[in-house]
Amino acid sequence: MYLTQDLELFHEYTVTQLLFKDVKNATELRKMAVNGEIKGALINPSMVVDAFQILVATNKAVHLHKIGKMKTRSLYSEIIFNLSPTNNISEAFKRFGISDSDTAVHIVLVHNKEETLNIDDIISKVDGQQIDVGQVSEMTDTAKIKKLYKITPQEDKCGTLLDAVVCRMAIKDVA
């Protein structure tokens, strides 16, 4: 149901992703995240192509956190910001964070391997149905993603949407 992976460059950290549909309490979840009651990034799954996209954003966020160069105030807000192709923080939250009307949520948790993570506590806060993280592609709004990341038809023919999105995320700070 959920996906837990170690970060290759930061062996002491583990990333856990959870996906929910038919969520009825997005407003409360968003408020809990803002207040620090949920220590995780709450992401709109319609803007996610694959769990790997989240892993890339998380890896970059942990790296920036460790070297003290984050552009946002927390590790979890940095994950959301890293998903965006632009450097506008508020736009990143509007497009990639959850809104009060959302009925699905992709939760990303980052934890030290030595810490115990109570996944059941997070799951109990969500009034919705947990589904396998691999199903995130079924929720993807492909047209919206292509428009936001400016994916050309030529690029679409020669590579995958995931490759194009991850490339845009990677070069954001360079371009």
UniProtKB/Swiss-Prot annotation:
Disruption phenotype: Embryos display primary microcephaly, leading to early lethality. Marked apoptosis is observed in the brain (telencephalon). Fishes do not show a renal phenotype, possibly as a result of early lethality.
Principal location: cytoplasm
Family recorded in the similarity comment: Belongs to the CGI121/TPRKB family.
Keywords: Cytoplasm, Nucleus, tRNA processing
Quaternary organization: Component of the EKC/KEOPS complex.
Gene that this sequence comes from: tprkb
GO biological process, one term: tRNA threonylcarbamoyladenosine modification
Protein name: EKC/KEOPS complex subunit TPRKB
Compartment(s) of residence: Cytoplasm, Cytosol; Nucleus
GO cellular component, one term: cytosol
InterPro entries, per database record: CGI121/TPRKB, CGI121/TPRKB_sf
Keyword Disulfide bond: no
Keyword Cytoplasm found: yes
Function: Component of the EKC/KEOPS complex that is required for the formation of a threonylcarbamoyl group on adenosine at position 37 (t(6)A37) in tRNAs that read codons beginning with adenine. The complex is probably involved in the transfer of the threonylcarbamoyl moiety of threonylcarbamoyl-AMP (TC-AMP) to the N6 group of A37. Tprkb acts as an allosteric effector that regulates the t(6)A activity of the complex.
Source organism of this protein record: Danio rerio (Zebrafish)
